[in-house]
Amino acid sequence: MAALAEEQTEVAVKLEPEGPPTLLPPQAGDGAGEGSGGTTNNGPNGGGGNVAASSSTGGDGGTPKPTVAVSAAAPAGAAPVPAAAPDAGAPHDRQTLLAVLQFLRQSKLREAEEALRREAGLLEEAVAGSGAPGEVDSAGAEVTSALLSRVTASAPGPAAPDPPGTGASGATVVSGSASGPAAPGKVGSVAVEDQPDVSAVLSAYNQQGDPTMYEEYYSGLKHFIECSLDCHRAELSQLFYPLFVHMYLELVYNQHENEAKSFFEKFHGDQECYYQDDLRVLSSLTKKEHMKGNETMLDFRTSKFVLRISRDSYQLLKRHLQEKQNNQIWNIVQEHLYIDIFDGMPRSKQQIDAMVGSLAGEAKREANKSKVFFGLLKEPEIEVPLDDEDEEGENEEGKPKKKKPKKDSIGSKSKKQDPNAPPQNRIPLPELKDSDKLDKIMNMKETTKRVRLGPDCLPSICFYTFLNAYQGLTAVDVTDDSSLIAGGFADSTVRVWSVTPKKLRSVKQASDLSLIDKESDDVLERIMDEKTASELKILYGHSGPVYGASFSPDRNYLLSSSEDGTVRLWSLQTFTCLVGYKGHNYPVWDTQFSPYGYYFVSGGHDRVARLWATDHYQPLRIFAGHLADVNCTRFHPNSNYVATGSADRTVRLWDVLNGNCVRIFTGHKGPIHSLTFSPNGRFLATGATDGRVLLWDIGHGLMVGELKGHTDTVCSLRFSRDGEILASGSMDNTVRLWDAIKAFEDLETDDFTTATGHINLPENSQELLLGTYMTKSTPVVHLHFTRRNLVLAAGAYSPQ
């Protein structure tokens, strides 16, 4: 944003405060707490226009020690202060005290004035009779001048300041309090915050603005935007929602309850429909006491709302606020918004609507600039013995016929190193065991019989319906070889079924195992206890509903996550719990094994995702950044990244190596409930309660497709084994198949609009829909493609 710095027209003078420095609360979400010691805003002086929080010493963990910058202009409405020297003696002390009291009265700081007057033993009449407002004698002139060098002075000059994050700087607005510049003609106050974090956050709403003017301020801006040109109206309309929320919260915090109620009733209907859930929560905040325990309000306050606006639209807004001298709105723009300015044509209404909707606005362009290794790791070389009958398609059961072994050509499919793949040793992965190699051989054999899907060859769908599931089915998973299916239930149990004729058996007791010949060829069969054989195993251990389940790639283990805040690892050899992983403070909504095993990820109500290893009791990484519950988690095919979907309506991609967030995707209008990566690792599909499926290019961090058709929450997404078909399952009792090849073809990513970080989405989602398959009355909870590209779906029958 260096180019914007050329707009600076005035220079602020920085003075060390004579008293103890005012500690401003760090701006969470913009680098606070990283030990920079400076402000969290971008641009010159630590903030575009607001230089009051510029630090004089660094390294304080993100809490800035501010110097105070004084505007060259006098505060509007204040009388000029003569520079006469004070007289000596006791009269001077009295005059000084009266000058301070007069200053507090002019600033409408009645409580401070009353406390100081009582302490000095002065009568009310003495203060009232010391002179009319603005008439300060020479004895108090120096004191008043000194005070003015410490406090907030807001001077509506010829040019309005730019908001933090834009990098531009106009006329300097000086802020010595957490609330930013005061109203026109007022001198603000210095506020020292020694309160807990919540109080420090809420104190930003402590201002002296006229509550009766809020409706006029908002109506004036609304009228200006609605009367602007069409090309600017869509972009400037993004201001409505964040300004509405912050103005309402200011009124509530300052106990103007009637004005707040009137303001909400008048303007809440003007907000976009996808913000209605947030507005319902906001409407319940009618008193100052309600704000301290409300997470939604704190989220909105501590994270700057991001708006992406073209330079032309921004200049139009800047001129309007300059002419109207609307400092109340400009204060909110400075303190709570991050305006990301780009050069180029303003975006259309359609482009903006496709990207907005999250709790904190759009993602900053810088958030999606990191390099992502989305390629696949090189597969190990394994010789696959193929029979002649297998090649001719005669051996349907895939059993070896003891023919002469041959090398499978498909074994060399991924032998070439992908240029976009991470280094093989970027993160330590478990070594392949002999059983893993055998499983890969079976997988490659199945691949030779895989059906090639497409618009003219759609897959068959096998639906597993859970009947009489009065325990409440909450989670489903299927093993990679499609031999086992697990269900998590609200009665805190996990149930495992065999979907093949082979029954589930436990390992024999230790006393019986000692009698087995370990050198025999069928030792793996002999260790199993036939007396325990059954089609169903029930696992007990959780103390709350089970919300997530995931099989390990080798089918030896099962993970389950629960409302009790734990993730449990179950052995599928003994059907007992091996480990309970404790780290989450609240319910754990989802968990998933890495494609290579060993690692797994979990996400829950505490707004963080955690990376674990099966042999560690504590998490290896904590992925923190979401503003609401982490509803779903998914490993990238190369295991170097983890995707998380949240109730804050964003999707984040995390680097397993260092725990950094490398991608933030916004565009959903409801909480995200499903994620899946394409088999080549380049694309990500996400589904949410808004019924839409969005497609993302991971390498460029851009939305490349939008699939509309579902009328309820999209609970499950899965690509076919070769990536030709995308299947989606929803609470609307349907499975839909989409043409993934057509959705991603002809994407010239090099021609993406770099200025806006967005492309024009093709309006052909119905053309991409290949088929819709309805169930009788069963929401689709889980989808799975077998190794031969047969679709398995699962859900619990719920009669209307």
From Swiss-Prot:
SMART domains in the record: WD40 (SM00320)
Protein family (similarity comment): Belongs to the WD repeat TAF5 family.
Subunit composition and interactions: Homodimer. Component of the TFIID basal transcription factor complex, composed of TATA-box-binding protein TBP, and a number of TBP-associated factors (TAFs), including TAF1, TAF2, TAF3, TAF4, TAF5, TAF6, TAF7, TAF8, TAF9, TAF10, TAF11, TAF12 and TAF13. The TFIID complex structure can be divided into 3 modules TFIID-A, TFIID-B, and TFIID-C. TAF5 forms the TFIID-A module together with TAF3 and TBP, and in TFIID-B with TAF8. Component of the TFTC-HAT complex, at least composed of TAF5L, TAF6L, TADA3L, SUPT3H/SPT3, TAF2, TAF4, TAF5, GCN5L2/GCN5, TAF10 and TRRAP. (Microbial infection) Interacts with SV40 Large T antigen.
Main location: nucleus
Gene name tied to this protein: TAF5
Biased composition (Basic and acidic residues): 407-418
Ranges of biased composition (kind: Low complexity): 165-189
Entries under Gene3D superfamilies matching the protein: TFIID subunit TAF5, NTD2 domain, YVTN repeat-like/Quinoprotein amine dehydrogenase
Region feature NTD2, mapped onto this chain: 194-340
CDD domains: TAF5_NTD2, WD40
Positions of the UniProt region annotated as Disordered: 1-74, 153-189, 384-438
Written domain comment of the UniProt record: Distinct domains of TAF5/TAFII100 are required for functional interaction with transcription factor TFIIFB (RAP30) and incorporation into the TFIID complex.
Gly residues composition bias: residue spans: 30-50
Record key words, sorted: Host-virus interaction, Nucleus, Repeat, Transcription, Transcription regulation, WD repeat
Protein's job: The TFIID basal transcription factor complex plays a major role in the initiation of RNA polymerase II (Pol II)-dependent transcription. TFIID recognizes and binds promoters with or without a TATA box via its subunit TBP, a TATA-box-binding protein, and promotes assembly of the pre-initiation complex (PIC). The TFIID complex consists of TBP and TBP-associated factors (TAFs), including TAF1, TAF2, TAF3, TAF4, TAF5, TAF6, TAF7, TAF8, TAF9, TAF10, TAF11, TAF12 and TAF13. The TFIID complex structure can be divided into 3 modules TFIID-A, TFIID-B, and TFIID-C.
Record-level GO BP terms: DNA-templated transcription initiation; mRNA transcription by RNA polymerase II; positive regulation of DNA-templated transcription; positive regulation of transcription initiation by RNA polymerase II; regulation of DNA repair; regulation of transcription by RNA polymerase II; RNA polymerase II preinitiation complex assembly; transcription initiation at RNA polymerase II promoter
Protein name per the record: Transcription initiation factor TFIID subunit 5
Residue ranges, compositional bias (Acidic residues): 384-395
Positions annotated as WD repeat: 468-507, 541-580, 583-624, 625-666, 667-706, 709-748
